[in-house]
């Protein structure tokens, strides 16, 4: 008898819990159309463009006919956005940089800055014989593999990938998640220049995804995370 009462009590609790869960589910309607006129992705978009220029600069060494030597100071200046090193004046005058938002988790930021100097040594080695592989185990330089000509460090790691993929994780992903994790701390009452601080924060976090504001309807110009 006692076991029967206990069993009935447990069943009753389960039914009650099930009903309560159903009652607590939020109700919402999905909009049929969206308005993106006040979307502002400028901060994150500028950082994506800065990375693109830095990556393109390193890629100038990825050739079997030419052997440009990289400049470590230029790479560092681009990273800190000083001395007008970008080809786009909008980037130079933006007051935005990559370094101040790059996470140093696992020592990445320090490792990246060291790689700028290492890349100079590798590009100098590659310049000696621009049409041949100069990289080998323990020796940085140019690696020719099929139709690919890439600048690698002494461990065979591509400098472009250290920069590009590293910033995608240590800045774009890290900053987007940091913003979203603290989204409730942003003001969502006062409208300034067409958006609240919280709305702008959402936009900035979304911008690090590297897609148009009306993605996935529009899939033009996908960059970084958005291109995967």
Residue ranges and their predicted role:
Residues 23-228:
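Mature extracytoplasmic or organellar-lumen-exposed domains after removal of signal/transit peptides
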Residues 2-9:
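Sec-dependent signal peptide recognition
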């Amino acid at each position: 008898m006692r076991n029967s009462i206990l069993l009935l009590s447990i069943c009753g609790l389960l039914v009650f819990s099930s009903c309560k869960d159903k009652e607590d589910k939020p109700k919402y309607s999905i909009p049929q159309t969206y308005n993106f006129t006040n979307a502002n992705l400028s901060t994150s978009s500028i950082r994506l463009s800065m990375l693109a220029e830095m990556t393109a600069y390193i890629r100038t060494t990825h050739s079997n006919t030419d052997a440009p030597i990289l400049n470590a100071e230029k790479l560092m200046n681009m990273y800190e956005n000083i001395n007008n090193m970008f080809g786009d004046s909008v980037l130079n005058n933006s007051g935005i940089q990559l370094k101040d938002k790059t996470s140093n988790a696992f020592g990445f930021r320090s490792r990246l800055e060291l790689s700028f100097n290492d890349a100079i040594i590798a590009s100098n080695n590659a310049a000696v014989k621009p049409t041949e592989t100069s990289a080998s185990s323990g020796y940085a330089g140019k690696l020719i593999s099929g139709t690919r000509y890439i600048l690698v460090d002494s461990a065979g790691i591509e400098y472009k990938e250290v920069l590009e993929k590293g910033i995608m994780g240590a800045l774009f992903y890290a900053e987007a998640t940091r913003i979203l994790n603290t989204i409730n701390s942003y003001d969502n009452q006062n409208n300034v220049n067409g958006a609240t601080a919280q709305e702008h924060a959402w936009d900035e976090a979304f911008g690090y995804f590297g897609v148009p504001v009306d993605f996935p309807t529009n899939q033009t110009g996908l960059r970084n995370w958005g291109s995967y």
